[in-house]
A protein has these predicted regions:
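Ubiquitin-like/PB1-type beta-grasp interaction modules and other compact soluble beta-rich domains
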Residues: 1-101, 120-127
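Auxiliary tRNA-acceptor-end handling modules of aminoacyl-tRNA synthetases
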Residues: 50-71, 92-96, 104-349
Length: 349
């Protein structure tokens, strides 16, 4: 078998047999971190189990890197889905992406998950992690994937595949008895996923459409070590203490009313005092820094915004025009044109 030249970032170029995997290189090459969970081949995020068939650049990454952490999070979503299927076999799986420091998976379940259910799911995830199941990826044609997921009655996967081009080549990932449709990449085995926590569950609509089936969305997080996990969970606890929704209710600052509209707070006397104090502080800081305040109308002729160019770019996100004596007026969406008018009102040297 012929050899290929692999340029390993931080180490240099070395020859390997054609078909070698990054995982084999990681195991056999001095200087490559054993904490690596994924890699980039010629800049493309790739499974450690992928075969290298030509000369390439290779970069290994652990879960502390942004790309590595995204792979760990996504792999943990699959781990959770497998645990859910073991505990609740009638569940239908949908999608499970990663977010910033978190992941979620949407499930079609008979009854919403309780706190006790989440604890059971997390415990089952620990068991699957301890089983250290190899995570294997396969490439399937559209028809092969359709046949497979139709046979195991995963209707949402069938719907996703049906929406793809007929010539689409698909990847599936398997760990033990669980197989999911996914672009990947993933960690090499479930045993790598050790430090995770399920955070919450809530309702969600399939494909974010309220006319579709209501699903159960479970959020979680996952890190390379226990220290980073605890640090993140502590940060979440601190955020909860400072949540404006919690503080606003506890201090009786404001509330919302459906007849007024979403995102339009009604400030109570306590809230009004807070606003006055914040405005006074802002004025004090601005004055100390040499700024002068002006005030401009809340309504403006559309002509001004047309002249400034704002109307052309922002009309879709502005309140509709109000017809006053045959002239279009708009709620003020930006200050710049008015400030230009004030500046131009007096001669400047």
């Amino acid at each position: 078998m012929s050899n290929i030249l692999v340029n390993i970032k931080g180490i240099g170029s070395q020859e390997f047999s054609k078909g070698v995997t990054p995982l084999q290189i990681m195991t056999d090459t001095k200087g490559v971190s054993r904490d690596s969970i994924t890699c980039k081949v010629d800049g493309v995020l790739t499974d450690l189990s992928a075969q290298l068939l030509k000369d390439c650049d290779l970069q290994f990454m652990d879960a502390k890197s942004k790309d590595g952490h995204s792979v760990l999070l996504h792999s943990t979503a699959h781990l959770m889905a497998q645990a859910v299927k073991r505990l609740f076999p009638k569940t239908k799986v949908t999608i499970g992406p990663y977010l910033d420091n978190r992941f979620y998976y949407d499930f079609d379940v008979e009854t919403p998950f309780s706190e006790e259910d989440l604890a059971k799911i997390e415990a089952e995830m620990v068991k699957i992690s301890n089983e250290n199941l190899e995570i294997i990826h396969e490439v399937k044609s559209r028809d092969e994937a359709l046949s497979f997921f139709d046979k195991i009655e995963e209707d949402y996967k069938v719907e996703i595949i049906n929406d793809l081009d007929k010539d689409e080549i698909l990847k599936v990932y398997s760990q033990g008895e669980f197989t999911d449709l996914c672009r990947g990449p993933h960690v090499p085995s479930t045993g790598i996923i050790k430090h995770f926590k399920l955070l919450s569950s809530s309702a969600a609509y399939w494909r974010a459409d309220e006319n579709n089936q209501t699903l159960q969305r479970v959020y979680g997080t996952s890190f390379q070590n226990e220290k980073d996990l605890k640090k993140y969970l502590n940060m979440l606890e601190e955020q909860k203490k400072r949540d404006h929704r919690k503080i606003g209710k506890e201090l009786d600052l404001y509330f919302f009313d459906d007849e007024v509209g979403p995102g339009l707070p009604l400030w109570t006397p306590n809230g009004a005092v807070m606003i006055d104090e914040l405005e006074a502080l802002a004025k004090e800081k601005e004055t100390a820094s040499g700024y002068l305040r002006v005030k401009t109308p809340h309504l403006t002729k559309g002509e001004l915004y047309e002249k400034s160019g704002h109307l052309k770019h922002y009309i879709s996100s502005m309140y509709p025009a109000m017809d006053v004596d045959g002239i279009d007026y708009y709620m003020k969406a930006m200050n710049c044109p008015h400030h230009h008018k004030i500046f131009a009102n007096t001669p400047k040297s």
